[in-house]
From Swiss-Prot:
Coiled coil: none annotated. This is Large ribosomal subunit protein uL16c. Its main location: plastid. Residues 1-22 are annotated as: Disordered. Keywords: Chloroplast, Plastid, Ribonucleoprotein, Ribosomal protein. The gene is rpl16. The keyword Plastid applies. It comes from the Eukaryota. Part of the 50S ribosomal subunit. InterPro entries: Ribosomal_uL16, Ribosomal_uL16_bact-type, Ribosomal_uL16_CS, Ribosomal_uL16_dom, Ribosomal_uL16_sf. It holds the Pfam family Ribosomal_L16.
Length: 134
């Protein structure tokens, strides 16, 4: 699973996902990409599941770039705990994704292989996405 090596602070506010993505919304490395159409938190497990699905489907051909990184800690309180007594401890990491953000890129394969691999990765995501070609 992806997670930061170290962070300045252990816990973060939840924040808001307003507007569209102004950074990371163009294809930079590969020829094909998966683009988010909705705002969401994508967990490190979901990112890894999508990456594995793409890698398995493409087999040894091509190269895959993961364009998002889970850098936001999500805290959870233990089950059956009374209210108060502070914020819960960090449980997992998420990447904050806004509409327009590129999630994965792929290159070095034909379009139909890329489309199939990226559609498998898209099925692992909790949001609507689209396949784009540079």
């Amino acid at each position: 699973m992806l997670s930061p090596k170290r962070t300045r602070f252990r816990k973060q506010h939840r924040g808001r996902m307003k507007g569209i993505s102004h950074r990371g919304n163009h294809i930079s490395f590969g020829k094909y990409a998966l683009q988010a159409l909705e705002p969401a938190w994508i967990t490190s497990r979901q990112i890894e599941a999508g990456r594995r699905a793409m890698t398995r489907n493409a087999r040894r051909g091509g190269k895959i770039w993961v364009r998002i990184f889970p850098d936001k800690p999500v805290t959870l309180r233990p089950a059956e705990t009374r209210m108060g007594s502070g914020k819960g401890s960090p449980e997992y990491w998420v990447a904050v994704v806004k509409p327009g953000r590129i999630l994965y890129e792929m290159g070095g394969v034909t379009e139909n292989i890329a489309r199939r691999a990226i559609s498998l990765a898209a099925s692992k995501m909790p949001i609507q996405t689209q396949f784009i070609i540079s």
